[in-house]
Structures are given as C-alpha cells and as structure tokens.
Amino acid sequence: MQRSGNPRVSVVVPTRNEARNLEVVLPAIAAVRPAVHEIIVVDGHSTDDSIGAARRTLPWVRAITQTRKGKGNAMACGFAAATGDVVVMFDADGSADPAEIPAFVSALVAGADFAKGSRFAPGGGSDDITLLRRTGNAGLNGVANALFGTSYTDLCYGYNAFWADLLPLLDLPDPQTPAPAEGMLWGDGFEIETVLNCRVAAAGLRITEVPSVERQRIFGETNLRTFADGTRVLRTLLSEHRRADRRKAARSRH
C-alpha cells in the first residue's frame, strides 16, 4: 500500500439486517467517480439475507461475515480485509452520502492522515439529529478536545476515512481473537468510532474535518439511544485518555 495522488479506495460497510438499504446504498457507492477500488460489506449475522441482497445488487461486492459481534468488530474485520490505500467507513442505513467520498479522499491526498466527517463544519448539516443529540454531541466534543488537544466539531459522527497504512497504529482487537465467554473485547462495540478518534489524536496524526450532510435512514429503525450512547462515549473518552497516559509514561521510561 502506498500514499499517492490517486489512491485505491476501499469502502467498508458494516451491516446487520440492512438488506433493503443495501439495495439502494451499494449502487450509489458504485456510481461514485472516481470509482472506488472495492466495497466490503461486513455482515453481523443478519437474519434478513443481507449478504445475499448485497451480492444480488452488486455482484462484485466483497461480502464477509464478522468474526465476533459488535460494530467495532465488523469494522476491524473490514479494515483487515481491505486491499486499498484508503479506507472509508460507511454506514449501511443510507444516512451517509456516497457523493462525499471524493471529498474525504481529497483531504487525505492533501496531507491529512485521518479525514473526520463533520455535520457542524461549514457546509455540513443533518436531516436527522435532534436538539438533545446536538447538545450532547457538543458537550462530548468539549471533553474530547480538552483531553486530547483536538478541535473536533462532531466527535459522534461515524463517516470517516484514513490511510490504510495507519492500521497498526490504531491497535484494534485482532479479528481472529476468539470471543470472550462473557462480554465483548474493548473496541468491538459501538465505542469503535470514539476509540479511533482518540487514538489518531493520541498518536499525533494529522486530522482534517470534512463537511458532511447526514440524511435520514432509508428503511428501518435507528439503534441510537441518546443517553446510553452518550454515557458510553464519555466512558470511552476517559478510558482512552488513561490508555494514552499509560503509553506516554511507558515511552518515557525507555
């Protein structure tokens, strides 16, 4: 893998029971120009034949099944399978606009290591966010920026892209590690997006925000739970800050 002005782009789409949405989303991604290198659908043991729908809709799609459970594990499986130079994180529900993919890639080509989507950067927006979620997001942005010295305006948005050569630095759980008898591995759940935001900041990587407009999901109901998810993000921020401090202390001893 190499960094160039014309990178190969891998789009990773975690999915669980999103068959109807995939029938709309996959052709839209495939229509993006410049064309993406590959689309990887990572299925979370769906019961609605999401993999079958993906393959019928787009025969050249790469469809795999995640090794454990949780969105974070699905992402890690997709990242490990990616063969492109750039990895784009893309939700299956239709809330992200595939036409924005070139803007994320352009930010990376221009010098960023991590392109962070933001609904609150100039030119961004949302058809879906509530006042309560907007307020909570702003508070969590403040915590993240105070802890990590960042300038995030939209910590909780999952539309992001990064150079694939950064994967070792992110230190995500190995997809081949067996699932624990109880609970989940850290990073396997919905905390994955916050974990990534924290780790790229702790590593001192170059972060560029990309304006993005969030749309309403096409079919189905959202899994978002405002208070529970906000609490989880806050716990993740504190945990990742402690992790960064431990690593910094370990480096100073050597």
Where are these regions (language model features)?
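N-proximal low-complexity "stem/linker" segments adjacent to membrane-targeting elements
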Residues: 1-30
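Cell-envelope/extracellular polymer assembly enzymes that use nucleotide-activated donors
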Residues: 8-10, 38, 195
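Short beta-strand/loop segment that forms part of the nucleotide-sugar
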Residues: 26, 30, 36-45
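Conserved donor nucleotide-binding strand/loop of the catalytic core
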Residues: 37-40, 51-81
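A conserved acidic beta->alpha catalytic loop
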Residues: 43-51, 94
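Acceptor/aglycone-binding surface of glycosyltransferases and processive sugar-polymer synthases
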Residues: 67-69, 73-81, 98-186, 190, ...
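Short aromatic/hydrophobic "clamp" motif used to bind/position activated sugar donors
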Residues: 87
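Catalytic donor-sugar/metal-binding loop of nucleotide-sugar-dependent glycosyltransferases
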Residues: 188, 194-215
